[in-house]
């Protein structure tokens, strides 16, 4: 009996020592028949409008989908927690939402290569004393839960124990900035690029101390089973970096918003409400295949929408046309608003058509406006100068670097048409781009977005104060 029990016990022990195997379901990777991109709404991230989709992350995602030869599916979420969960559950393939690299994100996800850099800044309202010490603020900081700003403040709190803040889950960055402008909250933290873009519509925003500098904005990939997608992303990034796409998009979304004039911005917003309604129909009618808002932005830069504007140099009217230019395009009364707008549109269209075909469609308007300002001949001089300096003569970002050189004897003496105030042309174009951005934002407030299937067929064009009276000067063209 004892021997029998011993045999049974030994049997149990042998069974217990054997390795127990559990059949786990094998991971089946998502077959990439489309690129599912999780994102957040924001002007520099992803926006939908009557003109299609736009945003740095959107433009890059669309190019990545084309690189992979699959359709793009943008999947907006309302907060970061939902985004993170969706990526972990394999509901999306990648997060492209203007997120910076942080220790917490490095621990949870795989991070793609850098797209651009931002600073984290404290944001307050015009009229409030500029804060110098974040631990001695007269008011409270409100930030978004699960954002990189939580990590930043947590680190600062170690050195400033009295530092406290509120976290919200039902707002986004744009809402918090609007709440600052509307005096609903005291302070928030935002990326510098977001502040620069939003103060075109909320001019009372002010940037305070920089809390974190030169943070890389990256895309997030799943922590596991993403080797193939990461390899493809790295190859794509390398290709686009060499092609100048990152520089192009940086110029497109951020190049023209770094300059800011508080008084001018407020005046422009007032003019949109009080003056533009009288002339909007004229801009829409005579713009033709141009975006009427670009035509209106150009007119504001020229005359502040004053049909009786005059300059000592002899230019007049809404579009500040010279007399020779007016005759050339059949305008008899430059002080008549409709005639001036019609003439300005025709002249701008002519400038666009004269440009070489090598200049991409998305850049042609900015080249044309520079031609509008200092003359086509000087723009051609600048393009040739750019080429001699091994810069791209068909990229506005490079022409911006070269145009100011036309004011230096070392350079203009080598050109065909000589001296030109190229730096003013750069400022002129950038100002129009800022006005255009603001008009688009205001116009879109009352419009419904296009259907999603139509939006992805469009790649948004580039968005983008010199003294009035610079339009179509009398010089070689």
UniProtKB/Swiss-Prot annotation:
Residues 446-477 are annotated as: Disordered. One of its GO terms (biological process) is cell wall macromolecule catabolic process. Residues 1-22 form the signal peptide. Keywords: Cell outer membrane, Cell wall biogenesis/degradation, Lyase, Membrane, Signal. The keyword Nucleotidyltransferase does not apply. The keyword Ribonucleoprotein does not apply. Its EC number is 4.2.2.n1. The active site is at residue 302. InterPro entries: Lysozyme-like_dom_sf (IPR023346), MltF (IPR023703), Solute-binding_3/MltF_N (IPR001638), Transglycosylase_SLT_dom_1 (IPR008258). The N-terminal domain does not have lytic activity and probably modulates enzymatic activity. The C-terminal domain is the catalytic active domain. This is Membrane-bound lytic murein transglycosylase F.
């Amino acid at each position: 009996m004892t021997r029998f029990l011993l045999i049974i016990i030994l049997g149990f022990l042998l069974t217990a020592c054997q390795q127990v195997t559990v059949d786990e379901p094998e991971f089946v990777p998502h077959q990439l028949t489309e690129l599912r991109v999780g994102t957040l709404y924001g002007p520099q991230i992803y926006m939908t409008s009557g003109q299609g989709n736009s945003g740095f992350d959107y433009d890059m995602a669309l190019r990545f989908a084309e690189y992979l030869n699959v359709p793009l599916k943008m999947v907006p979420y309302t907060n970061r927690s939902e985004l993170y969960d969706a990526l972990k559950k394999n509901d999306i393939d990648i997060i492209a939402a203007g997120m910076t690299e942080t220790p917490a994100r490095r621990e949870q996800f795989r991070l793609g290569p850098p797209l651009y850099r931002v600073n984290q800044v404290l944001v307050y309202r015009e009229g409030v004393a500029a804060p110098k010490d974040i631990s001695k603020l007269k008011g409270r900081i409100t930030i978004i839960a699960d954002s990189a700003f939580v990590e930043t403040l947590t680190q600062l709190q170690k050195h400033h124990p009295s530092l406290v803040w509120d976290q919200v889950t039902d707002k986004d960055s744009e809402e918090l900035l609007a709440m600052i402008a509307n005096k609903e909250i005291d302070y928030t933290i935002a990326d510098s690029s977001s502040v620069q873009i939003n103060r075109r519509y909320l001019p009372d925003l002010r940037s305070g101390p920089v809390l974190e500098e030169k943070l890389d904005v990256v895309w997030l990939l799943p922590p596991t089973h993403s080797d193939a997608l990461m390899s493809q992303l790295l190859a794509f990034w390398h290709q686009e970096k060499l092609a100048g796409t990152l520089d192009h998009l940086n110029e497109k979304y951020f190049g023209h918003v770094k300059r800011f004039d508080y008084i001018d911005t407020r005046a422009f917003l007032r003019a949109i409400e009080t003056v533009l309604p009288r002339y909007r129909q004229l801009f829409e009618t005579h713009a033709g295949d141009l975006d009427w808002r670009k035509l209106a932005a150009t007119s504001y830069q020229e005359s502040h929408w004053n049909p009786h504007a005059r300059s000592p140099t002899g230019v007049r009217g809404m579009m500040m046309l010279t007399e020779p230019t007016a005759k050339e395009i059949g305008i008899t009364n430059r002080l008549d608003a409709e005639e001036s707008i019609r003439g300005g549109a025709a002249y701008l269209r002519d400038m666009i058509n004269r440009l070489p075909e090598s200049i991409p469609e998305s850049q042609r308007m900015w080249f044309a406006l520079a031609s509008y300002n200092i003359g086509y001949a000087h723009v051609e001089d600048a393009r040739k100068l750019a080429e001699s300096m091994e810069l791209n003569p068909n990229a506005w970002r490079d022409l911006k670097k070269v145009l100011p050189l036309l004011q230096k004897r070392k350079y203009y003496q080598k050109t065909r048409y000589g001296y030109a105030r190229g730096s003013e042309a750069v400022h002129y174009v950038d100002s129009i781009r800022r006005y255009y951005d603001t008009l688009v934002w205001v116009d879109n407030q009352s419009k419904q977005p296009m259907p999603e299937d139509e939006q992805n067929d469009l790649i948004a064009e580039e968005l983008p104060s010199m003294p009035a009276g610079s339009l179509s000067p009398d010089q070689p063209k």
